[in-house]
């Protein structure tokens, strides 16, 4: 999942 630095951990991955 493409997430921001804040959502990165919340999404459990993605792109910082």
Curated annotation (Swiss-Prot):
Top-rank taxon: Eukaryota
One GO term (biological process): adaptive immune response
Keywords: Adaptive immunity, Blood coagulation, Coiled coil, Disulfide bond, Hemostasis, Immunity, Innate immunity, Secreted
Keyword Secreted in record: yes
Post-translational modification: Conversion of fibrinogen to fibrin is triggered by thrombin, which cleaves fibrinopeptides A and B from alpha and beta chains, and thus exposes the N-terminal polymerization sites responsible for the formation of the soft clot. The soft clot is converted into the hard clot by factor XIIIA which catalyzes the epsilon-(gamma-glutamyl)lysine cross-linking between gamma chains (stronger) and between alpha chains (weaker) of different monomers. Forms F13A-mediated cross-links between a glutamine and the epsilon-amino group of a lysine residue, forming fibronectin-fibrinogen heteropolymers.
Cellular component terms (Gene Ontology): extracellular region
UniProt subcellular location: Secreted
Role: Cleaved by the protease thrombin to yield monomers which, together with fibrinogen beta (FGB) and fibrinogen gamma (FGG), polymerize to form an insoluble fibrin matrix. Fibrin has a major function in hemostasis as one of the primary components of blood clots. In addition, functions during the early stages of wound repair to stabilize the lesion and guide cell migration during re-epithelialization. Was originally thought to be essential for platelet aggregation, based on in vitro studies using anticoagulated blood.
The protein's assembly and partners: Heterohexamer; disulfide linked. Contains 2 sets of 3 non-identical chains (alpha, beta and gamma). The 2 heterotrimers are in head to head conformation with the N-termini in a small central domain.
UniProt note: domains: A long coiled coil structure formed by 3 polypeptide chains connects the central nodule to the C-terminal domains (distal nodules). The long C-terminal ends of the alpha chains fold back, contributing a fourth strand to the coiled coil structure.
The protein, known as: Fibrinogen alpha chain
């Amino acid at each position: 999942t493409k997430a921001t630095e804040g959502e990165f951990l919340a999404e459990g991955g993605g792109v910082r």
